[in-house]
Amino acid sequence: MEALLSIFVESVFVKNMALAYFLGMCTFLAISKKIDAAIGLGIAVVVVLTITVPVNNLMFNYLLADGALAWAGLEGVDLSFLGLICYIGVIAAIVQIMEMVLDKYFPALYGALGVFLPLITVNCAILGAALLMVQREYTFSESVVFGVGSGVGWAFAIVALAGIREKLKYSDVPEGLRGLGITFITVGLMSLGFMSFGGIAL
């Protein structure tokens, strides 16, 4: 249990997807203009990461890894070179299924998140989480916690940036830095702040 808690805290603060690895920066910068939009996208990312990381873990361990097909009588087969394209396929399929389920059973939630769901398919933080999970050789339970933690960390970062950007609208920012200029500086300072968590022994 302590190991799972360590993975969660580490993925939220120490190894934050947005502020430590700089993954998902396209949507991170584009959707962080308003807090409401940032919260919507953050929730969608948490849900998608919570589902896709464990599913990709199962697929890697039972289909792609070296010797994973021993249950089918194919012991010497190693399909790990297909990992990247398979993870992308799983992410796209799960996002599409999620979109259809929300549209049919939760139309109000679909109306709120509908714009963000297609953006998640091409969010590199989702793919990055799957690749990091394989690289770190997480078990299924660890991959679930890592998926949730990575999503929460990314959502926390985008909501924090959106709050700062809303305050910056009323600040006297030099003309040359308005827009993305001051946003890049802000993200850099946020990232420096999150680096302080690197000293935590987990």
Curated annotation (Swiss-Prot):
It is found in: Cell inner membrane. The chain crosses the membrane at residues 11-31, 35-55, 81-101, 114-134, 144-164, 182-202. It catalyses: a ubiquinone + n Na(+)(in) + NADH + H(+) = a ubiquinol + n Na(+)(out) + NAD(+). It is a multi-pass membrane protein. InterPro entries: NqrDE/RnfAE, NqrDE/RnfAE_oxidrdctase, NqrE. GO terms for cellular component: Gram-negative-bacterium-type cell wall; plasma membrane. The keyword Iron-sulfur does not apply. Pfam families: Rnf-Nqr. It comes from the Bacteria. Its EC number is 7.2.1.1. Keywords: Cell inner membrane, Cell membrane, Ion transport, Membrane, NAD, Sodium, Sodium transport, Translocase, Transmembrane, Transmembrane helix, Transport, Ubiquinone. GO terms for molecular function: oxidoreductase activity, acting on NAD(P)H, quinone or similar compound as acceptor. Belongs to the NqrDE/RnfAE family. HAMAP family: NqrE (MF_00429). NQR complex catalyzes the reduction of ubiquinone-1 to ubiquinol by two successive reactions, coupled with the transport of Na(+) ions from the cytoplasm to the periplasm. NqrA to NqrE are probably involved in the second step, the conversion of ubisemiquinone to ubiquinol. This is Na(+)-translocating NADH-quinone reductase subunit E. It comes from Saccharophagus degradans (strain 2-40 / ATCC 43961 / DSM 17024). The lineage of its organism: Bacteria, Pseudomonadati, Pseudomonadota, Gammaproteobacteria, Cellvibrionales. The gene is nqrE.
